[in-house]
Regions:
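Extended hydrophobic secondary-structure segments that form protein cores and membrane-embedded regions
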Residues: 29-30, 61-65, 137-140
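Generic alpha-helical scaffold signal
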Residues: 34-42, 65-66, 81, 108, ...
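Short, surface-exposed basic-aromatic patches at helix termini and helix-loop junctions that form
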Residues: 53, 75-78
Length: 143
């Protein structure tokens, strides 16, 4: 398949050649930063966290930054397929107002409004994220 490249060390490559990539082999799922580019992974996220990883029982570490962190946190929610669809829809439908005469909203305004969006999305469900029976969320950030 030309649309997918798999990078693996020698031992991992041999394992995949012999057994294929199985859900029980996954121990870490990374979620990169990248703003709206992360949304193109929505169908893959829904498959991986909706059906595929459900076929295994091991602990999985989810590591993410920026949109990758929100994607990985969403994987920890009850009904992840529905949650991923809502995350995508909410992200796409964001709208930022700004004052007359400004060419764009201020960074503070964007931060405040995005913070409210996160509260609206995850509010009341933080324990689902933090107490998932199998997934351990790790958020990478820098200032």
């Amino acid at each position: 398949m030309h649309a997918l490249r798999l990078y693996a060390g020698p031992q991992a490559r041999r394992h995949i050649e012999q057994h294929g990539l199985r859900p029980q082999d996954v121990r870490v799922v990374p979620g990169a930063a990248g703003g709206p580019k992360g949304l193109v992974l929505g169908p893959l996220d829904r498959f991986i966290f909706g059906d595929w990883l459900a076929g295994s029982s091991q602990q999985v570490h989810l590591v993410g930054a920026s949109i990758g962190a929100w994607r990985m946190a969403t994987a920890c929610l009850d009904e992840p397929v529905t949650a991923f669809q809502r995350l995508e829809d909410d992200y796409i439908r964001q709208h930022f107002d700004w004052q007359p005469g400004q060419k764009r909203p201020s960074a503070q305004h964007v931060s405040e409004q995005f913070g409210q969006s996160l509260q609206d999305f995850y509010g009341g469900r933080v324990l689902q994220v933090l107490q998932h029976p199998r997934y351990r969320l790790h958020i990478v950030t820098s200032r």
